Swiss-Prot record:
Binding site for Zn(2+) 1: 116, 137
Protein name (Swiss-Prot/TrEMBL): Zinc-type alcohol dehydrogenase B
Species this protein is from: Aspergillus flavus (strain ATCC 200026 / FGSC A1120 / IAM 13836 / NRRL 3357 / JCM 12722 / SRRC 167)
Entry keyword set: Metal-binding, Oxidoreductase, Virulence, Zinc
GO function term, MF aspect, one: oxidoreductase activity
Pfam families noted in UniProt: ADH_N, ADH_zinc_N
Annotated positions binding Zn(2+) 2: 167, 170, 173, 181
Length: 428
C-alpha cells in the first residue's frame, strides 16, 4: 500500500506528488488527466504490472516512465490473487507474493492462468472446502525464485505446471501414476494456494513443472496444465489394449463437450476410430464438436435417436468405448447403457455421487472401466505431441482472455456456460 500526499496549491496537469514510503519521501511531478488540485491523503492498492494509479475521486494519475522502477520497487511484495470466500463468491484481493518454503520449491511469475470446470465444483459449493485460499490450478509463467534443492529448473525458465504436485521419486510417480504421488497436493485448495494470481509457489518443482517447448503459443500451453493432458488420458484409456486395426473399426461415444470433452475429442481422433459421436445438450458446444470432426448428438432433444444411431453403426451391439467427462451419475449411466458387452468406459469426470449401476449389471456386461484423475506430469510428453499438431484447432479455447483483475466477471461467465473457456492474463 502506498500513501500519496498532494499539496492543495498544486493543480493543473502536472501536480507534484510526494510518495510516503516508510521514513523516505520521494517527490516528482505526475502527468494527470486534468485539473487535479486536491488536499488529502489518498491510499491506493498498487501492483507491479500497473503503470497508473486510480481512485474513485481521482480520475487518473499516470506514473512517469522514468520513475516506474521506483514504483515497482515499492510494491514488489504484493500481488493480486483470486480468493475463495464462500459458494458463488470470489474476490480479487491483494496478497503477499509467495516465498520459497522448501528447498524443492520454485516461485513463478504468472503469465496465463485459466478457469477450469473443476474450479466450479469449489465455486458452486459442490466440493467442500475451506475459505481464504487462492483459486486455480492452470498456469504458465516465468521462474523468478528457485529453491536450493531444485535441479532441473533455473531462474528465467518459462514453465507450465501440472495441476497437482508430484515428487517424481515415489512408487506411483515411477509407475507413471503421478496423480497419486505420495506427496501430491492439488493447487487451489485449503492446503496449497492456487495459480489465479500474479505469482504462485510450486512445491516439488522438479517433478511437477515442464519447461515450455518451442513452437507452442503460451495461451495454448496453459491447457497443458490440466485439460489437454486430461483429454489425452481419457482418449488413450478408451483405446488401451486395442491395435490400430481394431480401433479403425470402432464406434466411440464421447459424453460431454465442454473444454475437457473437446480436448478428449481432439485426442480421440488421433487414434482414428471409425465413428466418433459427441453428446451434449448445448448447441454451441455441439457445433464445435462437429467442426472438429465428430458426429454431434443433442441427447435432450433426441435420446431415442442417439440409441438407434449407435445400434445402427454397430450392428446392434452398442458402442465399443465411451468417454465420459461430465462427472454426473446420469451421464455415466447413459454411457453404460450405450456400451456393448466387453466395452470400455473411460471416465475423467469428477464424480461425487454413487456409481449408477449394480454390480451384477457390470458383471453381465463384462464391463471394463477406468476412472480417476489424470496423471498430468506422467502423460505430458505424449499429450504435448498431440497439442503441437493440433494447436491451430484450439482458437475457441483462447477467445476469452481476460485481465486477472476481472476474474469475478470471468467466474460468472464461465459458471453460466456463456463461454467455452476463460483464460486470465496476470498483470492486467
Amino acid at each position: 500500500m502506498l500513501e500519496i500526499l498532494a499539496d492543495e496549491s498544486v493543480g493543473g496537469n502536472s501536480p507534484t506528488v510526494i510518495i510516503n514510503r516508510g521514513a523516505k519521501k520521494m517527490q516528482w511531478p505526475f502527468i494527470g488527466c486534468g485539473g487535479l488540485g486536491f488536499s488529502k491523503t489518498a491510499h491506493f492498492t498498487c501492483f507491479d504490472s500497473m503503470t497508473q494509479l486510480c481512485e474513485e475521486d481521482i480520475p487518473c494519475i499516470h506514473l512517469p516512465p522514468q520513475h516506474r522502477s521506483v514504483y515497482k520497487m515499492s510494491t514488489e511484495n504484493k500481488m493480486r490473487a483470486v480468493v475463495f470466500h464462500s459458494p458463488y463468491k470470489v474476490a480479487v484481493e491483494e496478497r503477499p507474493i509467495p516465498k520459497i518454503q522448501d528447498s524443492g520449491d520454485i516461485v513463478v511469475k504468472v503469465t496465463y492462468t485459466a478457469l477450469c470446470g473443476s474450479d466450479l465444483h469449489t465455486f458452486r459449493g459442490i466440493e467442500p472446502a475451506g475459505t481464504g485460499f487462492v483459486m486455480g490450478h492452470e498456469v504458465t509463467g516465468e521462474v523468478v525464485e528457485v529453491g536450493s534443492g531444485v535441479k532441473s529448473i533455473q531462474k528465467g525458465d518459462m514453465v507450465v505446471s501440472a495441476f497437482t504436485t508430484s515428487c517424481g521419486e515415489c512408487f506411483y510417480c515411477k509407475q507413471g501414476f503421478s496423480s497419486r504421488c505420495e506427496k501430491s497436493v492439488l493447487f487451489g485448495c485449503d492446503h496449497l494456494d492456487g495459480a489465479q494470481a500474479e505469482y504462485v509457489r510450486i512445491p516439488n518443482a522438479d517433478g511437477t513443472v515442464m519447461k515450455a517447448p518451442e513452437g507452442v503459443e503460451e495461451k495454448y500451453l496453459v491447457l497443458m496444465a490440466d485439460i489437454f493432458p486430461t483429454g489425452y488420458f481419457a482418449a488413450s484409456n478408451a483405446f488401451k489394449g486395442y491395435t490400430p486395426e481394431q480401433i479403425s473399426e470402432q464406434t466411440v461415444v464421447l459424453i460431454g463437450c465442454g473444454p475437457v470433452g473437446l480436448c478428449a475429442l481432439i485426442n480421440a481422433l488421433e487414434f482414428k476410430p471409425k465413428h466418433l459421436l459427441a453428446v451434449d445438450s448445448i448447441p454451441s458446444r455441439l457445433e464445435l464438436a462437429r467442426s472438429l470432426g465428430a458426429e454431434p448428438w443433442n441427447f435432450q432433444q433426441d435420446r431415442e435417436g442417439l440409441d438407434k444411431r449407435v445400434k445402427e453403426l454397430t450392428n446392434g451391439r452398442g458402442a465399443d468405448a465411451v468417454i465420459e467427462v461430465v462427472g454426473l451419475s446420469p451421464a455415466l449411466r447413459t454411457g453404460f447403457d450405450l456400451l456393448r458387452p466387453w466395452g470400455t468406459i473411460s471416465s475423467v469426470g469428477v464424480h461425487n455421487g454413487e456409481i449408477p449401476w449394480a454390480g451384477n449389471d457390470a458383471y453381465d456386461k463384462n464391463l471394463r472401466i477406468q476412472m480417476g484423475r489424470c496423471p498430468v506430469r506422467s502423460v505430458s510428453p505424449q499429450a504435448l505431441d498431440v497439442l503441437k499438431k493440433n494447436q491451430h484447432k484450439l482458437g475457441f479455447m483462447a477467445d476469452k482472455i481476460m485481465p486477472l483483475s476481472q476474474a469475478v466477471e470471468g467466474y460468472e461467465l464461465f459458471n453460466a456456460m456463456k463461454v467455452q473457456k476463460v483464460i486470465f492474463k496476470a498483470g492486467e
